[in-house]
Amino acid sequence: MSIVIPVYNQIHYTYACLLSILENTKDVTYEIIIADDVSTDATKELSLYAENLVICRNKTNQGFLRNCNQAAKAARGKYVMFLNNDTQVTPGWLSSLVNLIESDPTIGMVGSKLVYPDGRLQEAGGIIWSDGSGWNYGRLDDPEKPEYNYVKDVDYISGAAILLSNDLWKQIGGFDELFAPAYCEDSDLAFEVRKAGYRVVYQPLSKVIHFEGVSNGTDVNGTGLKRYQVENSKKLKEKWAEEFKKQSVNTGNPNPFRARERSQKKPVILVVDHYVPTFDKDAGSKTTYQYLKMFVKMGYSVKFLGDNFLHEEPYSTTLQQMGVEILYGPEYQAGIWDWLTKNKDEIDFAYLNRPHIAIKYVDFIKKNTNIKVIYYGHDLHFLREYREYELTGDIKKKRESDYWKSIEFSLMEKAAVSYYPSYVEEEAIHAIHPEYKIRAITAYVYEKFLENIDKDFAKREGLLFVGGFAHPPNADAVLWFAKEIFPLIRQRIDVNFYVVGSKVTDEIKALEQPGSGIIVKGFVTEEELASLYSTSRIVVVPLRYGAGVKGKVVEAVYNGAAIVTTSIGSEGIPEADRVMKVADGPAAFADEVVKMYQDPAECRRMCEETQKYIREYFSVEAAWKVIEEDFTPKKKR
């Protein structure tokens, strides 16, 4: 990494900049190149105050642009980072840029969020309108607002803090000297990066404090370098005249919704769910998260609204780094209807999740916008509650089933199409309302597939259950297994039962007693869970009621597990017998577990089938094939 800092006098700013780099750049190896444009102050003795600098001192004053070009020739790093001397960097500023550019080969240049010393925002990426005018998006606003904190494509990034590969820099030929001595060279570079086939992307995690105007002044009508801004803006418009025709139009009071992220040609999806998906804690969150990733991958601009309007870590930042804009905070909570009204012509699809959330938004969207509503129920709540009523005889569950039926059918009637994770729900709905448009979709979507799964089941040990205990069917499953099935198994084989999941109840915790063979681990990290999947011989999913495709079952298949489940657990899963054993009732379930546990070869056979199976039924390609027509905009932008 080569950090190029162009300087002309202002030694106190340069020194403060260097000090901030030293303090806040611990996770990237770098060199610093000082591009000294014949300074007359103490800058020329900078080597007396700082060590290990590469100092490139011009013989004559070259101006900002040529000074940068000349110094960059000395860069030895894979990447070149141009950083103004009137900046101070913050923790993670450089690693976040490097991580982003290395995460995607289509990205050619990345840049930082620029903040004024008083804490106000200077720029969250730049907009160039078709008339040649420009905006520092978000200028003087609160830099912590959601709209300034997601990764996005931008027209340009101010050259105060930009990074690109040394190879691409050389391929382009550096800053175009047409714009010497300064101004618009950064905008021009962004257009050159796109011309070379790459994207220009804003990284909000890279926060740089910028004392704007220290080097070049702020008066465009004066005698300083700032006066070149007006002249060079004309040159930029002339050079890129054809590209400017594709830019958004400045109407005098334009809505920057699409211009700020270069999504003029992209369909926009608003995804609504109960909260930011906690993808490592529950299956419902995982499916929402996987669909968000798929929408981004397929080229959509994705907005996410969690009904609790909370910013929850690390989940929110994970989505924002994927390129998803999240609507959170008191301002959005109070003004969500105004936001929808203001941007109704920019949003193509509203993807509403879960009945208790979707019902809050569907009527407003249908009445006040032309946004296409697609509803995903996750499972049929009324069917799940009715099955619990059948199992327990609890009349309250019958009333809850009737309540959910009215809500769910109301949503299906209002939505353009309603999704459920299997043909079972589709058939149940059409038995009552054959006129509703229902689609059975792929419930869980995987981009990557596991390699090198350890298939030596003979050295694996124990039975594993995974599931969040905020979901009542999971708690019922573990209690039933522990009390009625596990004792039958332990009579025949010496084995432990590991219970994993978030929000463990006291009743579940109480199952772990000395000599019981039951170990309640509770919530574990994704890494710990992967380890448990790879070391447990059998995954058990003893569900007695529920509805829809069960995420815990699909996840176990993805992880190459040997699985024993019930008819409810395998419900809606195509060709389930390829990758799992199904048994109902305590004796039959116990028999199947013991039989599988004592047959490592059969466990291995099942494991070897899993990745092929996941590719067929739960890949991005399989999922998108089912829903693509529903997410095709009526009009091209």
Residues covered by each model-derived region:
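Conserved donor NDP-sugar-binding/catalytic core segment of glycosyltransferases
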Residues: 87-129
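Conserved catalytic-core segment of nucleotide-activated headgroup transferases in glycan assembly
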Residues: 280, 284-289, 293, 304, ...
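Acidic donor-binding loop of glycosyltransferase active sites
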Residues: 346-348, 416, 534-548, 561
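A short, conserved alpha-helix in the catalytic core of glycosyltransferases
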Residues: 92-98, 149, 153-173, 178-209
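Glycine-rich, basic loop-to-helix element that forms the pyrophosphate-binding segment
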Residues: 58-75, 91
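Short aromatic/hydrophobic "clamp" motif used to bind/position activated sugar donors
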Residues: 80
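Short, flexible, basic/aromatic active-site loop/helix in glycosyltransferases
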Residues: 112, 117, 129-155, 170
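Acidic donor-binding segment of Leloir-type glycosyltransferases
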Residues: 22-60
